[in-house]
Every structure is written in structure tokens, then in C-alpha cells.
Amino acid sequence: MSDIIRIGNCSGFYGDRLAAAREMVEGGGIDVLSGDYLAELTMAILHNQRETRGSHLGYVGTFLKQVREVAASCRKRNIKIVSNAGGLNPKGMAEAIEKILAELGVNSLVAYIDGDDLVGDIAKLQSKGEAFMSTEKQIPLCESGHKVVTANTYFGGWAIKEALDRGADIVICPRVTDAAVVIGPAAWKFKWARDDYDALAGALVAGHIIECGAQCCGGNYAFFEEVPSYRNVGYPIAEIKADGSFTITKHSGTGGLVSVGTVTAQLLYEISTPEYYNPDVIAHFDSIKIEQAGDDRVRISGCKGSSPPPTHKVCINTIGPCKQTVEVLLTGLDIEKKAEIYLDSIFHNLGGREQFDDIDIQLIRSDKEDPVANEEAHAALRLTVTSNDSHKLGRLFQAKITELGLANIPGNTSRGATGNDGSPVLVYWPALIDSKHVSELVHLGANLIEVLPTQRLDFNHVYYENAPVEIDKIPIAEVATIAFGRLFGTRSGDKGGCANCGVWARTDAAYSFLYYFLTVDQLKKLLPDMRKFDIERYELPNMRALNFYIHDVLGDGASSSHRIDRQAKSLGEYLRAKIIEVPQVLIEELGVEV
């Protein structure tokens, strides 16, 4: 028996490369094919799918195409398939897969997991003291004023392990955590106990790294010029050992890059504190060791784990107010005055500002002085209005703006609707539930197996606390100006209505400078539009990294955010474009051109 389990990922989001599953299965040896399809935004998308196309849906339909391509090969090679593509309807997906298997003549055992759906139990749970307090707004769900349309508990990996223990070849999951599709198979392979927290933490870190697919193999990488090719970027494989240490790699002959840098970037993606919470374990990101172990091979070891928290996270989506966004291009001189006149005309035509519950105005100054092309003379005026009265928005709202086409400022040209179209938006409501109310249900043939979370079992509480690390200050003599991103990498993303921006250095000296330079106050100076938000800073000296957690920057989450970049994917590159002063020695050490 092999002393490792090789878990390949074939998807980082709903819409990822369709051929990735087949390429992962046929490209080399793996033991498990996994995929993550469920971003917070995806649950809202699946709800809309179910509402508009039928209650029999609510799952990730493209996964069925992948199963059709790889089911026979996986059965022949004894490759297990574990995916959260079941979304809001894991039973429906499992039934659809069984039909495909029958058509193909493939004899694979399909299990599905449910029990995560709380929509019908919200009132009962509230009567038992579960307030479903928003972890961002700190107000209970009953005060939201919105109707709940989805509510799903984030499960861990133990039900997956149970299904595999009982012989399942394909395990269809609902809203499990992103890393659960790795934790479950690893726990199955090595027969881990519930309190093997260090090993579980290692698998959690491995799952976090590979859950976004090609992103840890050079995708969206700050130092993209290091990546040999972006053609056919490979998808990641985690080679996990019994102690939870692992190596990240990809199939040979694929594009992309697996390096300490690409893995560090992914480790910093969509996190908050160094304590990474999961229903099965808390992984301490400040304890891990990362090292290059060969071409396209990065080894991670030393991860410490603690007992899981006493609560499970719940992803709730509610029906919010109606929103509509329009964007108009203003051109040439006197942009701010033109914007003022245009907005005054819009609201006069609509009957006044006061009729709307909220108004968000963004003037995006992409125009250049003395432009050399027509497009360089444009600035974008972006307007989003919110109302609980749908009659004030939609076609009427757009018509009233269109009427200004020949009767307003010179050089305006409409981009029309961009994003919100006047319909009700789905508002993301992250909450917690006491784990005593949680049980995971495994369906395998005629059998129904209840799996209790670790929190409901009798285990001693264990908590790891890392010793503080003292960072030496770098002596500063001669300084030079340079773009922040010439020296430092970033990776940013969304966490509900919040965003994170991880920053890392590539040498000890560069980290020493970064550690003392990039305070929260300094970040707000560099990014003035972030000044109004509460920001927390966390240190990860083992990765030469800092992480900034920015509260409320995305409003009520990606599905209703007013920002152009609703998921904060570009925030890090915005920071990297800023000009700063640094010690000249750092520029020389890294051989960077100013």
C-alpha cells in the first residue's frame, strides 16, 4: 500500500475548464479526483437556477459532463471522485450521475450527503436560541427584514470519510467547506482519528491550497513573468502523507508553475487570522514550513492543529431590496463639473433623490491629460440606486436616463446597465450555529448513516499557540522609489462583505522592511479609498507575509456589491501599482529594475 494519497483538483469555481477532469485523470496517477464548485456567490446562482429552471436543479450541471468523460476511466483505475457540485440538491445530482453510469455501463457506487439545508428549520432553531447573528453586521437574522431563500451549514470531511469507508466510488457533497473534499479522503486513507489534529490540519492546508484549481499553479500570480507558459495551465495535486505533511505538484507537460511563491499566494487567499477555522480542526497557518522540493514540487510540513470551534458556519442568502446600476462615460475637460450636472439632471428627471433608499456614486477617473486616443479621454460615472419599491427601477429608470441623451453635457456616452438591473438582489448573511444542532447524513444505496461532528463527541480540548517571533529591523540608509509590486507579491479575494489582501516578501530583508513599513495606517495612505473601512493586520513570519482583512468593503457580498470588482480579486494588484520609498539595498538584493 502506498504511503501517500494523491488528490487531484479539477475545478476551482463553477465555470472552470471543462476538460480539466479528463486531463487530471489521464495525465498521470492520482487516487482521488476532487473539485470545488461552490463560492459564496455560487449558492445564489444555484438558487436562481432552481427558481427559473425547476426545483429538480440547483446543482452544478457542468460537473455531469465531466463525470460522463471520466467515469469509466476512474472506475478502471480505482480513482475515487469527491465533489461539492451537489450544491443545493446533492440528491438530484446523485440521481443524474447514476443515470449517466447506467448509460455508460459503469458499475460505480454513488453516495450523496445532505442535512446541511436549514431553510425549513430556521424558525425552530431560532426558538431554541439560535439568533443566526451576522458575523459581519453583528445583528440577528430576525432583524434583517429579509426573506431567507437558502441556508446551508458548512460540513466538514467526516461524512465523506464514512461514505468512502462503506465503499462509495463517487461522493456528491452539498455545502461542505472547500477543504473538506481533501480532508475526507485523507482521513479515509490513513484512518485518522477525530483528534489527530495536526494531521487533519495538514490536510486542511492542502485542501485550501488546491481548492482554487490552477490558481496555485501560477494562475493569477503576482510575479506572472516567472511562469514559463500560461497555455494549458496544470491543475494541482496534493500528495499527502500519514502525518499530514504533503507536496503540491501538477502533471508534467502542463503549463503554469508550482513554486514557493505560487503556493504562498494561494495560502494567503481569502483568509483572515492565522487560525484557519474548519468544522473538523483549526489549522495554524503561522506554524507551517514551505520549501521547494524540485521542479514544480513544493513541500509543506509542520502544520499544527487545534480542536475545532464549537460552532459551524452557515451560508444564508436572503432576498434583499431592488438595485440598479448604470454607467455613463464622461469625456474630456471638466469631468467633475460634468458629473455634477449629469447627476443633478438624472435625479431631477427621476423625481428626486429622496425616493431611493440608498444611492452610491462612483466617479472613476480613467481619463488622461492630453490623451492620445479617444478612449483615453473617458472617465466612468457609475451610479447604483437601491429601493424596496421595484416600480421605481427597471425599464422606467433606464428610460429616464436615456431621455437625457440629447439634452445634457457634451461627450457623454452610456454603457447602459452594468450589473444590477432593478431586480431584487440576494444578500449574503454569514452566521454561526451551535454544532450541537448539526448532523451529516450519508445516503448510500438503501442505507442512511448519520455522522455526528467532532464537537458532539467526547474529546479533550486542544489548542496550539505559536510563540511570538521577533522581526529585526533593516537598517535604512540610501532609499529609492519603486512600485510596491516590484518587490512584494499580493493575493486578494472576498470573504462575504469583507475582503482580504495578503502580501508577501521574497527575502528576509524584504520582509523586515515590509513588517515595519506596511501598517494599517500606511495601507490606508497608499489606498485612500480604503480609509473609511476597519482593517485588521495579521502577521505570518513563517511565510514572510502579512494579511489585511478589510471589513464591509464589499457591502452585503458579491451578489449585491456596488463595486466593479465584486470579489476584490484586483485589490492586491492595485496595491502593487503604488509607488513607495524603499532601502536601495533591497532593490539591489532582488536585482529589480527601478
State what each model feature region is.
Residues 2-4, 40-56, 75, 117-146:
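Gly-rich Lys/Arg/Thr-decorated short loops/hinges at beta-loop-alpha junctions or inter-strand turns
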Residues 302-482, 495, 504-511, 516, ...:
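C-terminal non-catalytic interaction/assembly regions of soluble proteins
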Residues 270-298, 458-488:
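Short, Gly/Pro- and small/polar-rich lid/capping loops
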Residues 84-89, 168-185, 490-507:
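Conserved phosphate/anionic-ligand binding catalytic regions in large, soluble enzymes, centered on
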